[in-house]
From Swiss-Prot:
Keywords: Isopeptide bond, Ubl conjugation. It comes from the Eukaryota. Residues 158-175, 445-462 have a biased composition (Basic residues). The keyword Ubl conjugation applies. Residues 285-295 have a biased composition (Pro residues). Residues 516-528 have a biased composition (Low complexity). The keyword Transferase does not apply. There is a cross-link at K314 (Glycyl lysine isopeptide (Lys-Gly) (interchain with G-Cter in SUMO2)). This is Protein BNIP5.
Length: 669
């Protein structure tokens, strides 16, 4: 552009003179300023006028001066009000955003206003910097000590800064993208207006670069990194920049403080959470090891208690069957291996305990011992105590009476067989005596020999029968009754008992089976009879034989009640004793009936003739004999003397002493 052009159209002369520039030099600087700011319109708010850089040196000081003046925004507002009052009304309109109109493109109206505003800005900056210097020093000292929370104490200033920032964002959204950074360019243009043309021409390219750096506006962080707080040269250029950056840095400072406070609060919250977690974490770790430790102890204690209960239950359960076995003699394992002198009276009749009550007693005793696994030992002793207390006597009495009853019946049967054998022997002797008469001494010796032979033959038969039962595998083959005793006495009647009489009869095997099995059951009286083979004497069908057997049993019971009071009383007291007769064959029953009938006849004859009764001495010897042998055979053996033609007492008077001496000499005891 030609330098002869007058740039000061519409502008007073004193203003151009106050700038100290010649009319030739001023248009050059303004021309450059216009060329830089041709595309960028000015900001409408009053803060944008304070953000312009007058020179490159002042652009370097922007961030440091802004940091100094950010602590005193109130003073800046006061200074701004003073400048507004000092300006004339025509010039003050340029600072207000509401009254500021759109920029004019004519050179005559724009250039004088820019020069005037630049000079006024310099004066105001100098005044403000002189006022704010002591306050900036105080604020630096407080920052060096770490007094950061000043912004937290001034919430009103924060609100203002947030409002200003939001207003700027609104203005920036309204403008195009190319028009966003107008502040630094206008500031550079105004700075060039204030600089002489000779200096401006030399520093033009450098200022353009600095203007581009400062063009970041309020959103760029470069102005904060460029300056340092050590540069505090108090020049008019630096004073002129004091009022510009505070409003740019004001919205940022509170933001940084807010961020710092937010970070501090977050750290505090995180620390509290960590402390709470550290307090809560050891509790679940410490508690679980404490809780499971008593659990195995409880389990081990329960196991020990259960084992103790089982052992304590096993001991009384094993002891109770032993007690019951000794009291009631249940099986062969509780019986003695070697019988005493009279196994018939002591151990052979144990099968009589197989009655209904005797069968119920061991069941009652065995149930609590088997099922008492979960009960307490004290509960198991109570039934045993009750059983062994008042109920033991009746059971023992019944068992003893049944044994006594069986023994008497067997003795009666043995006597009947002996009588038959004697009758046969006497008949044979009579025949021989008729042919060859022999002395009486020889006859007696022959009778004794026949008796001995019969006894030994019975021994052989009994041993053979026992072997047969063992070979057949009967349930009672292992018992002591089925085995022959090791030592036999002279009297097979007392030693081997009923075996002698039954072995001669065809039903000996069946009778031994029933004796070994413990007698006939209570509910099946006909079982042993059906399993037993019939003799040829019985003849017809089993039904007739059963009817005849029942009739004979009734007749036998009636005769027993008449002949022997003790046996009759026992049958009346225990009707189940009648089942014992089912074990005998019909032949043996007939023998018993015949023997009892003969005894009835003898008793009736003795009642008629008192002379035939034995003297008291004979009864004394009989009682003595019965006491020593534990056999009451007085009434059963009275028929013995009738066949010889004299009474039983007379027979005893002649042979009692001789027979007793023979028995004592030949018996094992």
């Amino acid at each position: 552009m030609p330098r002869s052009r007058n740039p000061s159209q519409g502008m007073p002369r004193d203003s151009s003179d106050s700038c100290g520039l010649s009319p030739v030099e001023t248009p050059k600087g303004k021309k450059r300023a216009r060329s830089l700011d041709r595309q960028v319109p000015r900001k409408k708010d009053p803060e944008s006028s304070n953000t312009r850089c007058p020179s490159s040196a002042t652009c370097r000081r922007t961030a440091s001066d802004g940091a100094r003046s950010s602590e005193s925004p109130s003073h800046f507002a006061e200074a701004q009000g003073a400048t507004a009052a000092a300006l004339p009304p025509g010039e003050g309109r340029g600072f207000l955003p509401s009254e500021q109109g759109p920029p004019e493109d004519t050179k005559k109206e724009r250039l004088p206003r820019e020069a005037q505003q630049s000079w006024l800005r310099l004066v105001l900056n100098i005044l403000l910097m002189r006022i704010e210097e002591p306050r900036e020093k105080a604020s630096r000292a407080s920052k060096g000590k770490g007094d950061l929370p000043e912004a937290a104490e001034e919430p009103a200033l924060r609100k203002k800064s947030h409002e200003k920032r939001t207003s700027r964002k609104k203005h920036s959204h309204r403008k195009p993208i190319a028009e966003e950074p107008p502040g630094p360019q206008t500031a550079e243009a105004q700075g060039r207006e204030d600089v002489p043309p000779s200096l401006a021409a030399s520093s033009a390219p450098h200022e353009i670069a600095l203007g581009l750096i400062c063009r970041g506006g309020p959103d760029s962080d470069l102005p904060q990194a460029l300056p340092t707080e050590g540069d505090h040269a108090e020049t008019p250029d630096s004073f002129g920049q004091a009022s510009g950056p505070p409003l740019e840095e004001d919205p940022r400072k509170p933001d940084q403080d807010d961020v710092i406070w937010q970070i501090v609060e977050l750290l505090k919250k995180a620390g509290d959470q960590l402390e709470e977690e550290q307090v809560q974490i050891p509790q679940p770790e410490a508690v679980p090891p404490r809780k499971p430790t008593p659990l195995p102890r409880k389990k081990s204690q329960e196991k020990k208690s259960s084992l103790k209960r089982v052992l304590s239950l096993k001991k009384p359960a094993s002891e109770e069957p032993k007690r019951v076995g000794t009291a009631t003699t249940l099986g062969p394992e509780t019986r003695p291996k070697r019988p005493s002198f009279l196994p018939l009276c002591v151990s052979s009749q144990r099968a009589s305990t197989s009655s209904s009550l005797d069968l119920e007693a061991p069941e009652f005793q065995e149930v609590p011992s088997v099922d008492g696994g979960g009960s307490h030992p004290s509960e198991l002793h109570t039934p045993a105590a009750i059983f062994q207390g008042p109920e033991e006597k009746p059971l023992l009495d019944r068992a003893s009476e049944s044994r006594e009853f069986r023994r008497k019946i067997l003795v009666l049967l043995q006597s009947a067989e002996d009588e038959r054998g004697e009758q046969e022997a006497q008949a044979q002797e009579a025949e021989k005596a008729g042919e060859n008469p022999t002395p009486a001494g020889k006859v007696k010796s022959q009778v004794k020999k026949s008796n001995l032979r019969r006894a030994f033959s019975l021994r052989k038969h009994s041993s053979k029968d026992s072997k047969k039962t063992e070979a057949s595998g009967t349930p009672g083959s292992g018992s002591l009754e089925a085995r022959p005793p090791k030592k036999h006495g002279f009297l097979p009647m007392c030693v081997s008992g009923h075996r002698a009489s039954i072995s001669s009869s065809p039903e000996s095997l069946e009778f031994q089976k029933t004796e070994a099995a413990g007698g006939a059951p209570a509910g099946s009286p006909g079982a042993p009879f059906q399993a037993r083979s019939h003799t040829p004497d019985e003849g017809p069908s089993p039904e007739r034989a059963w009817e005849s057997k029942e009739f004979m049993i009734q007749k036998l019971v009636a005769s027993l009640q008449e002949v022997d009071r003790d046996l009759g009383r026992q049958i009346r007291k225990y009707p189940s004793f009648k089942r014992f007769f089912n074990e005998f064959s019909d032949a043996s029953l007939r023998k018993l009936v015949a023997t009892l009938e003969r005894q009835k006849a003898s008793l009736s004859e003795e009642g008629r003739s008192l002379a035939n009764r034995p003297p008291p001495c004979a009864f004394g010897t009989l009682n003595k004999f019965a006491a020593t042998r534990s056999c009451t055979i007085c009434t059963l053996m009275q028929s013995r003397g009738e066949y010889k033609g004299h009474s039983y007492a007379h027979f005893l008077s002649r042979k009692a002493e001789q027979d007793i001496t023979n028995l004592d000499s030949q018996s094992p005891d």
